[in-house]
């Protein structure tokens, strides 16, 4: 048996099983994310939320998914059918593909590559193409204009996200996500995590993630009460479901990045409790709760305000933070606190 797993066939089978496990975990989480999002929103508004299908409404998401799947797919006249169907599939698969390099515990990662952060950014950057393709292939000017706005929004906040992560890379000297988590290991538990030295960037990263995922209060592309569905206006049935699934998976990816980069991933918050994958899952669901609460309580921004914040506030702050972290790490300022994280230190 050991010889089989060491063979090319065993390696291929191992990769296939790991890929299926990642897909099963993310898609299973997706079901409860939609349910939790609706329940939290209902609780803030003093409603009950989903409560009919299944116990406590737990099967409501399955019922909604089945409803979308069995509906007729209405294709607009003059639409490019190939691109029309490729766009939602591409958006969901790229978000799902990024989880290949997300570690849930020590050794629990499908591809432990040294450029894991670059891999995630490459996958998330390509999601813009799915949005533009969906708007263009619909052969309608309104979805196309919405797709251009969405692309501008996503690209604008990717710059800030990248600069924030550069600060973490300077602190650890690595782009490997497992190495970043291990750099946060220490005798003081959560006080060793990067949320403390990088506290301002935690806030900036979270807000930028909201804009990157088109989540309220930055859901200007598909504001339900104003723009119907933005670039998804001409989509229905399963293609629309794939677009929505892609957005939730991208949000879950941001929850994973927040947990890994700033909150120790699978590390325990207190030294006397064992580390484990459950800490990673708990932290991811905490950040999902924060995403859901922001959706429920924060009013929507105007588009010009969104772009102004991204380019005139977040970009200078994140760039200045990179310079500050580089200086602190290079010259071992503040009692050598940054020295142990310095590149080459």
Curated annotation (Swiss-Prot):
Query: In which broad location class does this protein mainly occur, judging by the first location in its UniProt entry?
Result: membrane
* Pfam families (UniProt xref): NADHdh (PF00146)
Write out the entry's keywords from A to Z.
Cell inner membrane, Cell membrane, Membrane, NAD, Quinone, Translocase, Transmembrane, Transmembrane helix, Ubiquinone
- GO CC, one annotated term: plasma membrane
- Please indicate if the UniProt record lists Cell inner membrane as a keyword: yes
- Keyword Hydrolase present in the record's keywords: the answer is no
Task: Report the superkingdom from the record.
Answer: Bacteria
Q: Write out the GO MF terms.
A: NADH dehydrogenase activity; oxidoreductase activity, acting on NAD(P)H, quinone or similar compound as acceptor; quinone binding
The reaction(s) this protein catalyses: a quinone + NADH + 5 H(+)(in) = a quinol + NAD(+) + 4 H(+)(out)
Regions crossing the membrane:
15-35, 82-102, 115-135, 161-181, 190-210, 240-262, 278-298, 309-329
Q: Where in the cell is it found?
A: Cell inner membrane
Q: What is its EC number?
A: 7.1.1.-
How does the record say this protein sits in the membrane? Multi-pass membrane protein
**GO BP annotations, alphabetical order:** aerobic respiration
Could you give the subunit structure recorded for this chain?
Answer: NDH-1 is composed of at least 14 different subunits, Nqo1 to Nqo14. The complex has a L-shaped structure, with the hydrophobic arm (subunits Nqo7, Nqo8, Nqo10 to Nqo14) embedded in the inner membrane and the hydrophilic peripheral arm (subunits Nqo1 to Nqo6, Nqo9) protruding into the bacterial cytoplasm. The hydrophilic domain contains all the redox centers. NADH-quinone oxidoreductase forms a supercomplex with ubiquinol-cytochrome c reductase complex (complex III or cytochrome b-c1 complex) and cytochrome c oxidase (complex IV), which stabilizes the NADH-quinone oxidoreductase complex.
Function (record text): NDH-1 shuttles electrons from NADH, via FMN and iron-sulfur (Fe-S) centers, to quinones in the respiratory chain. The immediate electron acceptor for the enzyme in this species is believed to be ubiquinone. Couples the redox reaction to proton translocation (for every two electrons transferred, four hydrogen ions are translocated across the cytoplasmic membrane), and thus conserves the redox energy in a proton gradient. This subunit may bind ubiquinone.
Family from the record:
Belongs to the complex I subunit 1 family.
- Kindly give the HAMAP family that the UniProt entry links to this protein: NDH1_NuoH
- Name of the molecule in the record: NADH-quinone oxidoreductase subunit H
**Organism expressing this protein natively:** Paracoccus denitrificans (strain Pd 1222)
The gene behind this protein is nuoH
């Amino acid at each position: 048996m050991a010889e089989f797993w060491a063979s090319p066939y065993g390696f291929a089978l191992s990769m296939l099983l790991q890929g299926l496990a990642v897909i099963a975990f993310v898609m299973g989480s997706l079901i409860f994310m939609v349910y939790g999002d609706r329940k939290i929103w209902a609780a803030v508004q003093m409603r009950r939320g989903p409560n009919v299908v299944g116990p406590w409404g737990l099967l409501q998401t399955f019922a909604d998914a089945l409803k979308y799947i069995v509906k007729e797919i209405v294709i607009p006249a003059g639409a490019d059918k190939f691109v029309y169907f490729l766009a939602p599939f591409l958006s969901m698969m790229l978000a799902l593909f990024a989880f290949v390099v997300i570690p849930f515990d020590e050794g629990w990662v499908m591809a432990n590559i040294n450029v894991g952060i670059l891999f995630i950014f490459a996958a998330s950057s390509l999601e813009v193409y799915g949005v533009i393709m969906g708007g263009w292939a619909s052969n309608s000017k309104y979805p196309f204009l919405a797709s251009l706005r969405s692309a501008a929004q996503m690209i604008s906040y990717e710059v800030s996200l990248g600069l924030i992560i550069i600060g973490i890379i300077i602190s650890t000297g690595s782009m490997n996500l497992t190495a970043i988590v291990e750099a946060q290991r220490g005798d003081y538990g959560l006080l060793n995590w990067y949320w403390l030295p990088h506290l301002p960037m935690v806030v900036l990263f979270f807000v930028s993630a909201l804009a990157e995922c088109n989540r309220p209060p930055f859901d200007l592309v598909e504001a339900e009460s104003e723009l119907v569905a933005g670039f998804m206006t001409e989509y229905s049935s399963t293609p629309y479901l794939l677009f929505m699934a892609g957005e939730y998976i991208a949000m879950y990816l941001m929850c994973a990045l927040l947990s890994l980069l700033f909150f120790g991933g699978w590390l325990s918050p207190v030294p006397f409790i064992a580390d484990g994958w459950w800490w990673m899952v708990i932290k991811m669901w905490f950040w999902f709760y924060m995403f859901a609460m922001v959706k429920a309580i924060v009013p929507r921004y105007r588009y010009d305000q969104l772009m102004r914040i991204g380019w005139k506030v977040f970009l200078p702050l994140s760039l200045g933070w990179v310079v500050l972290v580089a200086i602190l790490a290079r010259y071992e300022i503040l009692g050598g606190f940054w020295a142990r994280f310095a590149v080459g230190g």
